[in-house]
């Protein structure tokens, strides 16, 4: 029995880290999808002090490693704990409301190990509906740049979190996810890794990422707060050595591209709120869009229309 157990530990190559908080109902599906995503893997569930039935749910599932945090520290803290707990060379990340597709990790492992200079591999995600995680038909991103992607990534975070498989050593050397970031901590990590490493990509769906809406109780459902936190992450990346050593015109370009993207996201949210009759939400998003791109005519026009409307 001991020989069998030791051999099992040796051949495992991938740890799938699943941070969770009060998602006992969704967690079993995430765990099952992780198990089917590849061979030679372990599943580590990091419970960020859930107050629901999460401990009992995990106790009833055989073959997983369950780690309960002493205090609720957020996603970055939980993911770092999972990485530290990992006994494998490679680490994949999966949120408790997302799903991995069968066999996806084996394909990504092949791409990741093709070059020692590669820090992580990502792929496309099918966007799932907020309630049942069923694919909506939308795929993100449409294209998956690879190689040296630092400057492309500085414009926008196009890497779906549940699609990433990384070398544990690079995550540790980067000092893990930044616990001071309550949102967009993944983009910050990918930027730090891509600054001086190559990135591999599998341009096919490898995960199902649940669409974020306010009703789904997801941290990433507030578009305005996401954009504000993302701006902070980009500003942090722009003072890192590689960005600082580049031409100022290049830095200005990626800043403009990001602000344009934030503006588009917020104006889309505002338009959706208008159609749903949520006047105050629409007004708030337009004001935030105006802050990112104050000289865009469309934002100015809608802003003043809303301010004058009774």
Task: List each model region and its residues.
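Flexible acidic/His/Gly-enriched loops in nucleotide-sugar-dependent glycosyltransferase catalytic domains
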Residues: 77-80, 105-170, 174
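Acidic helix N-cap motif at the loop->helix transition within catalytic regions
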Residues: 25-28, 52-60, 99, 103
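A conserved acidic beta->alpha catalytic loop
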Residues: 33, 47-56, 71, 95
């Amino acid at each position: 029995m001991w020989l069998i157990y030791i051999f099992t530990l040796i051949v495992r190559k991938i740890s799938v880290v699943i941070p969770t908080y009060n998602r006992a109902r969704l967690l079993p599906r995430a765990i099952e999808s992780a198990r089917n995503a590849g061979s030679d893997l372990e599943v580590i569930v990091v419970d960020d002090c859930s107050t629901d039935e999460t401990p009992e749910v995990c106790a009833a599932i055989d073959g997983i490693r369950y780690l309960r945090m002493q205090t609720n520290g957020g996603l970055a803290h939980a993911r770092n704990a999972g990485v530290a707990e990992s006994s494998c060379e490679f680490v994949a990340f999966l949120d408790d409301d997302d799903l991995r597709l069968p066999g996806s990790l084996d394909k990504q492992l092949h791409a990741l190990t093709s070059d020692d200079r590669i820090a992580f591999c990502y792929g496309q995600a099918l966007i799932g509906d907020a309630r049942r995680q069923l694919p909506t038909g939308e795929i993100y991103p449409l294209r998956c740049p690879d190689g040296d992607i630092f400057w492309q990534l500085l414009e926008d975070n196009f890497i779906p979190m549940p699609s990433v498989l990384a070398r544990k050593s690079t995550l540790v050397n980067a000092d893990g996810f930044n616990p001071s970031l309550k949102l967009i901590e993944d983009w910050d990590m990918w930027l730090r890794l891509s600054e001086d490493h190559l990135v591999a990509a599998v341009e096919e769906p490898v995960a199902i990422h649940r669409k974020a809406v306010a009703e789904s109780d997801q941290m990433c459902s507030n578009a305005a707060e996401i954009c504000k936190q993302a701006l902070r992450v980009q500003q942090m990346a722009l003072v890192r050595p590689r960005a600082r050593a580049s031409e100022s015109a290049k830095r200005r370009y990626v800043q403009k591209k990001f602000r344009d993207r934030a503006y588009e996201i917020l104006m889309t949210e505002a338009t959706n709120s208008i159609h749903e009759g949520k006047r105050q939400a629409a007004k708030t998003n337009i004001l935030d869009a105006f802050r990112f791109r104050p000289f865009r005519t469309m934002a100015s026009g809608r802003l003043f229309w809303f301010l004058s409307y009774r």
